A protein has these predicted regions:
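N-terminal [4Fe-4S]-dependent radical SAM core
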Residues: 2, 98-126
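Canonical Radical SAM [4Fe-4S] cluster-binding loop centered on the CxxxCxxC motif
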Residues: 121-154
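Conserved SAM/AdoMet-binding glycine-rich loop
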Residues: 78-81, 86, 165-287
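Conserved, mostly hydrophobic/aromatic
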Residues: 156, 173, 207, 237, ...
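Cofactor-cradling patches in redox/metallo enzymes
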Residues: 2-106
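A structural motif corresponding to the C-terminal lobe/cap of the Radical SAM core domain
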Residues: 233, 245-361
Length: 409
């Protein structure tokens, strides 16, 4: 049993990092709530502060360490997430407790499966598997999380039911690579999707990030499984580079053409859909030619969402000692790619003007507005007297930098 489980405490909670990591710590906190603990608004009120951490790049890791130090002045601190697994030893302090990899894996494989969801608002998603099947040379996440461990379908659908019983209407399933789900237990992601969408309740399902290599193996069945009206037509598939030489150096285990085939088939089946991808700029060996190949891929695929990250050398990875390109070149490439994608998204959003959308209201916005999601998971800001999880129709009358603006009809 993890420390603090079974004890009634006042909890202050902060979560950083990927959806998977937040989902896991959300389950942990819900486990404590089920034992009688409660959430407070400030660390000064808390018996313990729980912080979920991220170390994907060095600046983020530094911010995590600083924040942990700040929290430790107010209460005891429980550190979760990837920092605890890759650099937990740097946090030695009588007021700081680290959830070790062994401890969390034991908790994950047992006690998390039957957690009652007391507070759905802190749940970023439902984790479906730990670890991954990849061996990317730059990735510290696989170092932190280890080999693939998939959760049984019935445990996942059980937690979906709990969220729905608490009034949630948007369900997210998440992992480092959702397309890897079930490879270790003789089942695959499309089977899980069908099990979830077969539930009778009214909800929408968003499937989290999936890697190209595993997606290619299940593509046809996956696209069949998401045909349900309960599934957002949304695909997050990180490509990282549009240059084959760089992909090979990264040990990504797929080709540029593999990625393009996935995108092409997804959009053929679901023309009104949203594609999200990731690019890394400044990976070791990248030059102007390889960067231009990435720009060409960005132009050809025109993703609605594009996360662009400057390469950061991370300890315990094969590429830690390999030098990246000059920082001035990387800065230039990052800005050029970001500017180009802003033009893409501007055109994409403007093309939606005058269209009519059915929305699920998923969050409160600013200045008397609400934010809803259309069937492709586009965010739409709508003014009006609405409520969380209302279903509405609206006309698109404009857009902001990354969202649409709707008018109730």
């Amino acid at each position: 049993m993890c420390p603090h489980i079974g004890i009634e405490l006042k909890i202050y909670y902060e979560a950083y990092g990927c959806t998977l990591s937040k989902a896991e710590s959300g389950l942990y906190v819900n486990r404590m709530l089920a034992d009688g603990s409660s959430i407070v608004k400030t660390p000064d009120e808390a018996d313990i502060s729980i912080i979920n951490t991220c170390v994907v790049i060095k600046p983020t890791e530094d911010r995590m360490i600083q924040r942990i130090s700040e929290l430790s002045h107010s209460s005891k601190v429980k550190v979760m997430g990837c920092l605890s697994t890759v650099n937990g030893g740097s946090l030695a302090d009588e007021n700081i407790e680290v959830l070790t990899p062994k401890e969390f894996r034991s908790f994950y494989s047992g006690q998390l499966d039957d957690v009652e969801i007391r507070e759905p608002s802190i749940m970023e998603g439902i984790p479906i598997n730990q670890g991954c099947t990849g061996s990317c040379n730059f990735c510290i996440s696989r170092v932190a999380r280890g080999k693939l461990i998939s959760r049984p379908v019935q445990k996942i659908t059980g937690q979906v039911r709990m969220q729905l019983a608490r009034g949630m209407k948007e369900v997210r399933i998440t992992s480092l690579d959702t397309a890897a789900y079930g490879r270790d237990i003789d089942i695959r992601l499309p089977d899980l999707v069908r099990s979830i969408t077969s539930l009778e309740e009214d909800f929408k399902l968003r499937i989290g990030m999936m890697e190209p290599r595993n997606t290619s193996e299940i593509l046809s069945d996956l696209l069949d499984s998401i045909s349900s009206n309960k599934v957002f037509k949304f695909l997050h598939i990180p490509v990282q580079s549009g240059d084959q030489r760089i992909l090979d150096a990264m040990n990504r285990e797929y080709s540029v053409q593999d990625f393009m085939n996935i995108v092409s088939e997804f959009r053929r089946r679901y023309p009104d859909s949203v594609l999200s991808t990731d690019f890394i700029t400044g990976y070791h060996g990248e030059d102007q030619e390889s960067f231009e190949n990435s720009m060409k891929l960005l132009d050809r695929t025109k993703p609605e969402i594009c996360n662009i990250t400057r390469y950061s050398q991370r300890p315990f990875t094969p590429d830690y000692d390999r030098n990246p390109p000059p920082s001035n070149a990387v800065k230039k490439w990052t800005k050029e790619m970001s500017d180009f994608h802003r033009a893409i998204i501007k055109e994409k959003l403007e093309s939606q003007t005058n269209s009519v959308k059915s929305l699920l209201i998923t969050e409160k916005g600013k200045n008397e507005t609400w934010v809803g999601r259309d069937d492709a998971y586009r965010p739409v800001v709508v003014p009006g007297q609405l409520h969380l999880f209302d279903r509405i129709s609206c006309e698109i009358v404009g857009n902001g930098p990354t969202y649409l603006i709707g008018k109730l009809i």
